[in-house]
Structures are given as structure tokens and as C-alpha cells.
From Swiss-Prot:
This is Cytochrome c-type biogenesis protein CcmE. GO terms for biological process: cytochrome complex assembly. GO terms for cellular component: plasma membrane. Its main location: membrane. Keywords: Cell inner membrane, Cell membrane, Cytochrome c-type biogenesis, Heme, Iron, Membrane, Metal-binding, Signal-anchor, Transmembrane, Transmembrane helix. The keyword Transferase does not apply. It is found in: Cell inner membrane.
Amino acid sequence: MKGKYLLGILVILGALGYMVFGGLGRNLVYFLTPSEYLQDQARYQNRPVRLGGLVKPGTVQYDKDRLELRFVLTDGVAEVPVLHKGTPPGMFKEGQGVVVEGRFQEGVFQGTNLLVKHSETYQPPKEGWTPEEVRKLIEEAQ
């Protein structure tokens, strides 16, 4: 009788462990940096990958008519030109950390999905701020 209970508990714990750790691995966002890509370009040509880094200041160009966003992604060592079709996320800006999903084609990363990194920490307004300043801060963050 004890053996059946022990076996049942082990099966439940095994299933629970698989759900927790198996699901965790699928939800993590792994990405290449521009330096990693440049070290082995042939391996990643025409294959779906995630590329992560910072949007290089002064390189952002957005064509509203064609819905094309062009920018250079850098890790501080190497740079890769990116073309993303679609509207940029509201928090997208120069110097911002991003992860772009897509493929390398002819030396340009063709992005299909653009994820913007942001801080997970909430910072309350500093003392002495007026409600208008707080409202402006909130609007800029959206």
C-alpha cells in the first residue's frame, strides 16, 4: 500500500517538475549579439534567429508610408543593420535595448518581431514633483 502511494507521489512530482522546468526553457528569450553573429555569419544566414543589443543613436529611420523601421543594432563592439517591417513599439527609442526576431539576408537583419527591453523596477516620483510633471513622465514612458 505504501508503495502505491510513494509511486503516485513520485509520478505527480515528476509531472510537476516537467511542467515547471520544461515550460521555463521555452519561455526564456535567447538571442545572439551582433559580435556572435559576425563570428559565424554563414551559420545564421537565412535561418530564424533572435538578435539582441542596443539601438545605436543616430541610426533610426522610420518610413511611415511603407511601415519600415531601419536602425543599427550594436553590442558596443560590432554593429548589424536591421530592417523591421511594421510599426515600432511605443517604448522604442535610440539607445534602448531590443531583441529582434527574424533572418539575416544579404547582410541585413530582416526583423519580423521587435521586443523592447524595459526596466522591471517601479520608481515613485521624487518629492516635490508637480502632478503635471508626473503626468508627463507617465506619458513619456508609454
